C-alpha cells in the first residue's frame, strides 16, 4: 500500500476530450449534398455579423436605464476630496468603498433592484436584463419590450436565425455582462460613469465656479454659448455645472451634447464654427487685458467626458475587424495618417509636452502602473525610479522608521499615482533632461512617419519593414501619452488632462491598427479556425439519453475496439430517431450505446411529483391522496403528508437537518426523513424512466443520517450505460441511404498498427466504456458535446520528396537542438540548394548533423491540407464522489502529521536553469538534485533560448513568427511529468515559491510570470486527477481510480499557501543564502550612495585584520551596529565574521581547478552596465590597496582605523566596493557558464561554502541552492503544521521565522 492510497475518489473532475472524426461510407457525400457545412459556415459568419447588432440592443437598454438614474453625487465628491487632501490608506480605502457603492447603485438600475424606481419599472428592467442573455434576445421579445431599437428586416432575420442556436453566444454573453457589471472593470458602464467621467465633471464644476466668481461677466458669455449651440435650453449654465446635472450626462447622446458645449460644433466648409466654452476662454485670454490675466491665472480649460461604453467611433470605420489583403492594410493606414495630419495631433502633442516646462508639475501625474516602464526607458533599469521614490519617502518620515512604515511606503508606490515633480526631485535633474530628450525623439519619429510614403504592396520583407517602422513611431507616441493616463481622483491639472485626453483619443487607434496589421503580415500560411456543426439540430449531441435521441440526434457505437459517432439528420424536415433491431452478440455488427440517466434526484424527483402543477392544484382544495399515472408504469400515490413534507408553510423542511437543529425535534426529523426516502424509492420503482434501475445496494431508509448521505449513494445509480449488438448491414444501409451519418472517433492511438502508450484522452475514453466502469461508474459520459469543421487551408504545398535528404532537428548527441535560423541553411546545403557559401555557424555544426534519405513523400503541415471534422465531448471523472472536496487541505495535513518522515521536493525557476529540483528528506538531507533544462535527452533550455531570439527577430521584422507557445507547452508537460514521477516515487510534498509574494519576472524561458503561473496551474490540474498510464485501470493511480493530490482550483488569489500536497513559500532569502550557516547579505546597498555614507558604513564595523595562518582577511561586525544600512532582519545571528578568502587555487571532486573567493561582477562604464562581467579577486585587491596606501597588515593588527584615518575617499570607496563584492554570494556569467554560490562566512568547521567543490550532499550550483532552500522552507512550513491544533496553516513564513530557523539549524 502506498502512503497516498487514501487520496483517491475525493471529488469530481470534469474534462473535455477532443478527437478527430473520420466520415464513413457515403457520410461525407450526403452531408455535402444536403449543404449542411455551407449552412453552418453561414451561421458562423452570421454570428460575427450579429455582434454589433446585439451591441446596439444592449446600448439601447443601457440608455433607457441611464436616463432614469437619479443619484446624489456629494458623497463620492467628498471621498475624492478627502483622498486628494491626504493620500493615506484610509482615504484610499474610503474612496474605493464609495466608488463601489455608486457602481452598485447604477448596476441596480440595470437589473431592476433600485429603490428609486417603481416596482413595475423594476420588474420590467429585471425581465429585460434576463432576456438580454437568453433566447428572448433573438425571438423578438426583447426588441418589443425595448420599443426604440430600429432594425432592418435583414437584421431581424439574422436574429431569428439564432432563436434555437443561442449557445453560440455563451462567451459573448459573459463578456457583455461585464459591460453592465458593478465590479471595478474598466470596460463596464458603471466604472466609466463613476471613476472616469465623474471626476472630470467634478473638476469642470470647480473650474466653472472659480471662473465666474473671479470674472462674473463670463456667466453671460457662457450662457450665450449654450444658447448658440442650442442645448440644455431649459437649464441655466449654473445648473449645468452642478452635481445634480451629472445624472443627465450618463448616455452617449448627452455626453456628446456636453462635449459640444465645451468644444463647440464644426459645421460645413466655409461656415464659421460654433464656438464652445474653451474657445470663448481662449479668445478672452488673447485680448491681453486685466480680465485676460485673471482668466489665465486660473484653470481655464474644461475637460471633455469620455465616450460611454459600447458607443461607436464612426470616423474610424476604415480600421477593419481583420485585414485580408495588402491593399486593405495600406489604404486604411493612409486614411489614418491623413486624419492625424488634418487634426494636427502631433503638433498639439508637441505643444502639450513643451508646456511641462512652465506648469506646476505637482499636478501632472504618472501612472503607478507605468513606473517600471518609464524607469526602463529613462534610467535603463526597471526599479531605479521606484527605489529613488522609496528612499525619498522614507527620508521624509519623522520619528522611528518602523517596518510597518516601510511597508506602507511600498504599498503607496504600488497603488498610488505619483506627481512628476516628486519623481524629478527623487531621481534628479538628469531625469528631467532624459524625459525631454525621449519626448523629442518620439515626436520626431512620429512626424517622420506621417511624412514618409507607404509601399504599394507588402509582399517583400523590406515593404513590411517600412510599414512597421511608421507604425512603431506612432505607437511610441501613444505609449508615451499612456504614461500620464491616471485615475481622475488625483488632483490633475485640468488643462493638461483635457488636452492629453483629446490627443490620446486620436492616437488610440494606432494600437489596434498595429496589432491587426502585424497579425496580417505575420500570419501562418495555414488556418486553425474551425466552426461549429449543427446539421440543423439546435441541441445536437446535447445529451445521450436513449429517450432524447430524437431531439439530440447523436448516438455512439463500438466495433472491434474502435468507436463511432452516429448523427441522425432530419428526415423530410422532421426529427426522427432511427429504430435499430438488436441482434446476437455473436454476429458481426456495431454495439450501440443505450444511455439512461435521471439527473440529480434531489431536484428531479420533486419536479416530477410533488411540485407538478396538477399536484399543487389538487392539494389546494383536497386532503385526499392523488394518483399520478402519466409517465408511470403503475400509479404513484402522493399523500397530503408527503406533499406537505416538501411544501411546508415555514422553512426548513422537516426532513432537513436544519429543522432538527432549529427545533430540537430529533424524533420528528427522523420520521420525516425515513418517510421522504421511502417515497423517493417508491417513485423510482414506478417512474417509467427509472424502473430498470437496480436500487438493491441502497441501505434501509432508517440507516441514513441525513438526506445528503442518501442522495450521494442514490445519484450514481441513476446513470447507466449498456450496449446492444446491431447488425452491420442495418447500420451501413442507414449510412448508404443518408439516414445515418457515421464517423469514426479517431486519434493516432486508434491508427492501424499503432504501438506505444495511449494518450490520456484515449485512456479516459476507453476507460469510460470498459466493463469495469460499466459495472461501477467512475467515469461518466456527459452531454453538451460539440462537432466542428475545419476547412483545408489554401496554402502552398511543401513536401520532402523521394530521394531528398531530411535533416534531424537534433545533433548527433540527440540532445542539442539545431537553431531554426541555421536549420534551413543546413537543410538547403545537404540537398545542394544553397546559393551561397555555408556560414561559419552552420559549418561548425555540419560534422554533427544527422541526415536521412526520404523514402516516401512527406507533406509539411499535412493536417491542414484537407478538410477535418472534430468531436469535443465532456466527461466527469470520479463520478461517485462529491462535486467538490470537503476540507481537502485539512485531510492532507492530518496525513502529514501522521507521516512526519514525508520527503519534500523544492522547485526553483532558475537563472541558468529553466526549472531546478531538489528532493530532501525530513531531516534536510539531499536525496536528489537536478536541472530540468534537458529532459529525455533534449535540451529545452537551448531550444527555448534560440526560439525566443528568433521570435523577437521575426516580430521586429514582421516576418512569419515561429510559435514558441507550443514549445513551452511541451516543455511544461515534460516538467510536470518529471515532478509527478518524483512525487509518487518519494511519496513527497512539492514546494514552490509564491508568485504573489514579491514575484520578479526573470529573463527567459518560462520565468515570466504568466508562463510560470501556467506551469503552476498545469501542475495543480494534473494532480487534481493523476492517472499513471502504466497502472491497471482499477489500481490506485489507474484511470478508474486516479490520485487526487491537490485541492479543487478556483483562483490563485483564493488558494493561499497550500493546495493539497502542493505548498507555497515566499521566495526571499532562498537563492542568495549560505546553506552551511544561513547567512544572507544584511545590507541595503542603495542607502550607501556618497562619501559620507560610505565612511559612516565602514565605521560601523568592529575590526578588519589579516589571518596569518590562513591568508584570509576577517571583517567582524555586530548586527546591532550599522542599523541605518541594514534591511532590518530580526532573527539574524548577533555577530558575524566576513571572510575575504585567500585567492588561491582549489580543486573540485573531479580535480578541476578554481580560484577560492573569486567574484564575478558587472562591468560598468559611464555609470551604466555594459552587459558584460569580469572576474574580481577581493583578497588580492585588498592587499593591493593596503600596499598602495602603505598600510602594514601582515602582523594581524586591526587595519580598519588606518583605512579611515586620513579620510581617503579612494581607500574608503574601494573598501566599501570590496565588502559588497565579498558579500555577493551568487556569482554568474552566462558567457563562461559559471553559476556558483560562495559564502563569505565560515561554518562551525571553519569552512566557507563553495558550490564549486561539487559535493552532492550540498547544493551543486546557484539554482540548486534556490531549490534546496525552497525545500527547507517547506520543511519549516510542515513544522508549523505539526504544531497546529486545527490542521490549518495559520500563517505563512516570515523572513524572521525563516532566518531564525535556518541559522539555528546550522549554528
Curated annotation (Swiss-Prot):
Region (Bridge helix): 941-957
Keywords: Antiviral defense, Coiled coil, DNA-binding, Endonuclease, Hydrolase, Lyase, Magnesium, Nuclease, RNA-binding
Regions that span the bilayer: none
Protein task: CRISPR (clustered regularly interspaced short palindromic repeat), is an adaptive immune system that provides protection against mobile genetic elements (viruses, transposable elements and conjugative plasmids). CRISPR clusters contain sequences complementary to antecedent mobile elements and target invading nucleic acids. CRISPR clusters are transcribed and processed into CRISPR RNA (crRNA).
InterPro entries: Cas12a, Cas12a_NUC, Cas12a_REC1, Cas12a_REC2, RuvC_1
Region called PI (LHD), residue ranges: 599-718
Region (WED-I (OBD-I)), start-end ranges: 1-35
Protein name: CRISPR-associated endonuclease Cas12a
Effect of residue 780 to A: Nearly complete loss of guided indel formation
UniProt-reported outcome of changing residue 167 to A: Wild-type to slightly improved guided indel formation
Residue ranges of the region described as WED-III (OBD-III): 719-884
Positions in coiled-coil regions: 74-106
Positions that bind crRNA: 47-51, 175-176, 307-310, 752-761, 806-808
Obligatory cofactor(s): Mg(2+)
Site entry (Binds sequence-specific recognition of both target and non-target strand bases in PAM), positions: 607
Annotated spans, RuvC-I: 885-940
Family: Belongs to the CRISPR-associated endonuclease Cas12a family.
Domain text: Has a bilobed structure, with the REC lobe (residues 35-526) connected to the NUC lobe (residues 1-35 and 526-1307) by a discontinuous wedge domain. The crRNA-target DNA heteroduplex is bound in the channel between the 2 lobes. One nuclease site is found in the discontinuous RuvC domain which probably cuts target DNA strand in the crRNA-DNA heteroduplex (residues 884-940, 957-1066 and 1262-1307), the other in the NUC domain and probably cuts the non-target DNA strand outside the heteroduplex (residues 1067-1261). Target DNA binding induces domain movement.
Effect of substituting residue 1228 to A: Wild-type to slightly improved guided indel formation
Recorded name of the encoding gene: cas12a
